[in-house]
């Protein structure tokens, strides 16, 4: 059914969001008093620059009346907002208590509730969301004939095989429902999507129920005035995925796992757990468990209870990725994938993600470069754990090339330093994404957190120069085994600066070019 002003008003009333409808001097609760109430909207947008004849505009966030200049001439049909703009437009306004919640509900309705045509899987956690999501999509694609779509912080995939770079971990609600509609129209039957804490903080997934929610882990992150004021708020927002799910897959070793189980019990949903053990039966009890198959940790056994699921050798290094693999298998099983389908389960082995644990060897020196998205205490610690487990006996000289995001997650700056300073030889602080905060200020702040007098630190604000200098420095110490950890940006081809995406080669391409690969 097409979305009209009348049906939009009814939907908003149902969710106790509609305050009134205003058009000029008409203030009403009855859409029948508006002449155009039964005319279907031709489009929906939250960007005034994209308004065309028949469009419903959602005014959210820091919306300003001046954005409406010339909007009637563009063909605006109606708007949704928390305040009325009768002085700027002659079109009717649906005045609501919460514009973001309203936008999510109306977007779902406009696109014909595409989530009802998909089995929707939500993946949240402080670390591992992207890798787990890719593993899950690969596994489900293997059994469904490529019918799994993906929304991730790296790429979106709406047809099971074509990947396009994404902008947000969880898209704006309107974009999410538009992409769901496209995925469903492309014949997709499943959707795997990363769900950030901000998605619940700002209602990007309001009204969406997940067939399966995966809660991987939790540790402090995203604490800042513009994200979450406290860890409690961060965790509370993350927990909302459980309230809005039909089934939960839970990391058995997650902090506050007991609280998360209580949430699931209160919601009346079942829980499937997963865990990583040091050896068979040497760890927290869980339904799906991974543990090393050999002393070198080159492959891992995975089992579901008493059912052995085989040995796995992933294309992405790191023991923690076998934990992500166990999570993906638990998720797939929760949506009905048979654990007897060995070919499907082993589809995770071939998954590679650009910018995730990518390794490059320098032909000119004994240097290994690892490009990864690690960007907080937990992920930097996990990365260094992997390095020491794999190469610790070779006494590597480790250089960390890092920055930290501007204008948010301020605690990360100190935490990255704390995670690394007693385990590396050198820091090179450099550019990462920022809005208005100067890159050099962020780098200097991070340098100021160093307490280990033996670690060397340098600030090189230009990221290309920072990576280049790290490589030249490693070559100058060719008598040592050098490991360069270049973190935070992965394969992203831009750096955000003053709200603009400035073109950048990508850490992986810079390393490949310097190494002559």
Swiss-Prot record:
Its EC number is 6.3.2.-. The modification N6-carboxylysine is found at residue 238. UDP-N-acetyl-alpha-D-muramoyl-L-alanyl-D-glutamate binds at residues 48, 169-170, 196, 204. The keyword Ubl conjugation does not apply. GO terms for molecular function: acid-amino acid ligase activity; ATP binding; magnesium ion binding. ATP binds at residues 125-131. InterPro entries: Mur-like_cat_sf, Mur_ligase_C, Mur_ligase_C_dom_sf, Mur_ligase_cen, MurE/MurF_N, UDP-N-AcMur-Glu-dNH2Pim_ligase. Carboxylation is probably crucial for Mg(2+) binding and, consequently, for the gamma-phosphate positioning of ATP. This is UDP-N-acetylmuramyl-tripeptide synthetase. The lineage of its organism: Bacteria, Bacillati, Actinomycetota, Actinomycetes, Bifidobacteriales.
């Amino acid at each position: 059914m097409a979305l009209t002003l009348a049906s939009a008003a009814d939907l908003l009333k149902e969710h106790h969001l509609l305050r009134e409808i205003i058009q000029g001097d008409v203030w009403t609760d009855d859409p029948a008093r508006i002449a155009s109430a039964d005319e279907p909207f031709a489009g929906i947008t939250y960007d005034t620059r994209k308004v065309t004849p028949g469009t419903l505009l959602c005014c959210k966030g820091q919306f300003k009346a001046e954005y409406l200049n010339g909007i009637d001439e563009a063909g605006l049909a109606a708007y949704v907002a928390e305040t009325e703009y009768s002085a700027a437009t002659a079109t009717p306004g649906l005045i609501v208590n919460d514009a973001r919640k309203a936008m999510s509900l109306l977007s779902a309705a406009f696109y014909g509730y595409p989530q009802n045509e998909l089995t929707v899987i939500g993946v949240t956690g402080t670390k591992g969301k992207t890798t787990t999501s890719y593993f899950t999509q690969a596994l489900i694609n293997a059994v469904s004939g490529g019918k799994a779509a993906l929304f991730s912080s790296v790429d979106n995939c709406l047809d099971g095989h074509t990947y396009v770079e994404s902008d947000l971990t969880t898209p704006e609600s309107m974009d999410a429902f538009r992409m769901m509609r496209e995925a469903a129209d492309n014949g997709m039957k499943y959707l795997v999507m990363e769900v950030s804490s901000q998605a619940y903080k700002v209602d990007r997934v309001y009204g969406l129920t997940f067939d399966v929610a995966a809660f991987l882990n939790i540790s402090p992150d995203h604490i800042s005035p513009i994200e979450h004021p406290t860890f409690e708020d961060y965790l509370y927002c993350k927990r909302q995925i459980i309230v809005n799910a039909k089934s939960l897959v839970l990391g058995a070793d997650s902090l506050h796992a007991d609280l998360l189980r209580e949430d699931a019990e209160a919601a009346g949903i079942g829980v499937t757990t997963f865990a990583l053990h040091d050896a068979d039966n040497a760890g927290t009890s869980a339904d799906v468990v991974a543990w090393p198959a050999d002393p070198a940790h080159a492959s891992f056994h995975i089992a579901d209870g008493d059912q052995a699921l085989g040995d796995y050798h992933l294309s992405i290094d790191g023991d923690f990725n076998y934990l992500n693999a166990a999570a993906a298998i638990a998720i797939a099983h929760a949506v009905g994938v048979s654990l007897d389908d060995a070919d499907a389960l082993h589809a995770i082995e071939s998954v590679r993600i650009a910018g995730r644990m990518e390794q490059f060897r320098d032909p000119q020196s004994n240097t290994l470069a690892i490009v990864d998205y690690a960007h907080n205490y937990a992920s930097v610690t996990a990365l260094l754990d992997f390095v020491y487990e794999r190469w610790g006996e070779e006494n590597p000289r480790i250089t960390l090339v890092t920055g930290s995001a501007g204008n948010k997650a301020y605690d990360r700056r100190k935490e990255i330093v704390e995670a690394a300073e007693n385990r590396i030889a050198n820091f090179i602080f450099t550019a990462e994404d920022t809005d208005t905060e100067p890159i050099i200020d962020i780098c200097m702040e991070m340098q100021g957190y160093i307490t280990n007098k033996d670690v060397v630190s340098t600030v090189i604000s230009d990221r290309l120069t920072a990576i280049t200098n790290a490589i030249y420095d490693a070559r100058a110490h060719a008598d040592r085994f050098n490991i360069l950890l270049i973190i935070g940006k992965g394969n992203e081809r831009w750096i955000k600066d003053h709200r603009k995406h400035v073109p950048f080669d990508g850490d992986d391409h810079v390393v490949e070019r310097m190494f002559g690969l």
